[in-house]
Amino acid sequence: MTNILSPEKSENDQELPIRPSYLQEFVGQQQIKENLSVFIKAAKSRNEHLDHTLFYGPPGLGKTTLAKIISNEIGGNFKSTSGPAILKVADLAAILTNLEKNDVLFIDEIHRLNTAVEEVLYPAMEDFELDIIIGEGSAARSVKITLPKFTLIGATTRLGLLSNPLRDRFGIPMRLNFYNTEELKKVLNRASKLLDIDLTDSGSEEIAKRSRGTPRIALRLLRRIRDFAAVDGKSRVDKEISDFGLKRLEVDRIGLDSNDYRYLKFIADNYNGGPVGIETIAAALSEQRDALEETIEPYLIQIGLLQRTPRGRVITIAAFEHLKMPVPNQSHHQFNIFNENE
């Protein structure tokens, strides 16, 4: 699923020029910033490595950026890979044996590591030792390699898919949450200065309100609206051109696009608001289940348009009102039951 409001990384995002390098430059996630600052200072004062850290939460909120910031703050090299890229134990061994003291190893989508790789990672995280088997059959022997003290930073959008043994080995688990409008305005204002965009306060607020609580989306929308302003002969990005551009991009006043409307209308039209299983929705919309669960549903849940229940997905009264559709009596009953049992 690829669209302007997808929180997933895109080749066109070009975040490097505006990516913050240190904690004091990072906007939002205040409690995480404050706690990380304490943990980093404490580790440096003891001349120790920072404990292994796990960032989890919806995509586009700054997990990769924070990992790079930690690397800068502790003065180590930054090595990056992803769960799907580590196919074999040998792949992991090659990465680990090339680390130096205080290096940061960042593994994105860490929930997608296979079991064999995970089991080799456990002693590397706990004891900084790599146990590998060399040879085959009767000639096989175990070799233990001592590793330098490094910090593993894992990132995942699906905490529930992480195995308990792996999750328990992270000393610093941190959940990243959606941004509010004021925080997104700060992100946009910082970026506008670095990108030399004349962004007014009203223009910033209009973009922020429709960015689904996600900095990556806000920055993407800012670039596209800058394009509309340039072609329209406007020197600044104000509320008027922001609203014009966002309408052209089919982003409504609360940040929904055509994919969100398809999702909500399917449940409303075909199941009177639900409940309906996610597999049924995915098949009907010709989308992957993972794409719906990671790209569409988190924001709909966050703003109160969708509920996940044991029986399936249920859209709320607020969703019917936003769709300008009458609320079926059955849907109203389900919504009340869900809240009473919660």
Swiss-Prot record:
State the reactions this protein catalyses: ATP + H2O = ADP + phosphate + H(+)
Region ranges (Head domain (RuvB-H)): 253-342
- What is this protein's record name? Holliday junction branch migration complex subunit RuvB
Q: Which GO terms describe its molecular function?
A: ATP binding; ATP hydrolysis activity; four-way junction DNA binding; four-way junction helicase activity
HAMAP family from the xrefs? DNA_HJ_migration_RuvB
Mainly localized where?
cytoplasm
- Originating organism: Rickettsia peacockii (strain Rustic)
* Gene Ontology, cellular component aspect: cytoplasm; Holliday junction resolvase complex
Subunit structure, interactors included:
Homohexamer. Forms an RuvA(8)-RuvB(12)-Holliday junction (HJ) complex. HJ DNA is sandwiched between 2 RuvA tetramers; dsDNA enters through RuvA and exits via RuvB. An RuvB hexamer assembles on each DNA strand where it exits the tetramer. Each RuvB hexamer is contacted by two RuvA subunits (via domain III) on 2 adjacent RuvB subunits; this complex drives branch migration. In the full resolvosome a probable DNA-RuvA(4)-RuvB(12)-RuvC(2) complex forms which resolves the HJ.
> By its UniProt entry, which SMART domains does this protein fall under?
AAA
